[in-house]
């Protein structure tokens, strides 16, 4: 069984930061990520939104032709940029000596983590566990998610088409930025 000083569950911005900091201080570190390095921040959240807004606002980017937006080309560029960012984070972790395991990490005790990956299940021993698994969007009890009509924030960039109309619930920073993103593409967002 492999053994580490620290196991970090989650490879989003918090998990990667914790893993790099621990490795810089001399700890033997393993990071366990259920999906892709970068977590929600890079693949579902603010990064794709900021990249998309940047491309739409930059007239020389070629994504906004007098009000016509090639949404397929735009989403392809966003996806490519996100993959590059994920690879850069993965490279930085490797350079710092952090071991990466892809799978779902389940703490079995304060010193043992079970990793469930697609093809196998294995245990890893550790002295400490850092949980940085982030969050996931919740639906409003009276308005459940219907993937074609009511879309959680995590799924906004999965569909590479632009709807005719958008109604955004939530006015935090992400909701306001998302409203700007759609406003620039369809001319209205509520």
Language model features: what each stretch is:
Residues 4-31, 167, 175-184:
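N-terminal Rossmann-like FAD-binding beta1-loop-alpha1 element of flavoenzymes
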Residues 20-27, 32-164:
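Glycine-rich flavin
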Residues 12, 104-106, 172:
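Conserved acidic residues
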Residues 10, 80-81, 170:
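Residues that cap or flank secondary-structure elements
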Residues 148, 173-174:
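Short secondary-structure boundary/capping elements
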Residues 189-190:
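Conserved small/polar residues in nucleotide/adenosyl-binding loops
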Residues 151-154, 171, 181:
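Conserved mid-sequence domains
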């Amino acid at each position: 069984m492999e053994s580490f000083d620290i196991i970090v569950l989650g490879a989003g911005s918090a998990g990667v930061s914790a893993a790099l900091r621990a490795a810089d201080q001399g700890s033997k570190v393993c990071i366990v990520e259920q999906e892709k390095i970068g977590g929600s921040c890079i693949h579902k959240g603010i990064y794709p939104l900021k990249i998309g807004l940047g491309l739409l606002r930059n007239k020389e980017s070629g994504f906004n032709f007098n009000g016509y937006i090639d949404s397929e080309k735009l989403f392809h560029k966003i996806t490519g940029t996100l993959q590059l960012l994920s690879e850069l984070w993965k490279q930085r972790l490797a350079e710092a000596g952090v071991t990466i395991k892809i799978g779902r990490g389940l703490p079995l005790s304060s010193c043992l983590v079970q990793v469930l990956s697609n093809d196998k299940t294995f245990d890893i021993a550790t002295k400490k566990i850092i949980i940085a698994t982030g969050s996931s969007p919740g639906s409003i009890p009276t308005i459940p998610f219907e993937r074609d009509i009511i879309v959680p924030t995590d799924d906004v960039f999965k569909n590479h088409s632009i709807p005719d109309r958008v109604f955004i619930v939530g006015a935090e920073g992400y909701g306001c930025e998302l409203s700007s993103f759609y406003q620039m593409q369809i001319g209205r967002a509520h």
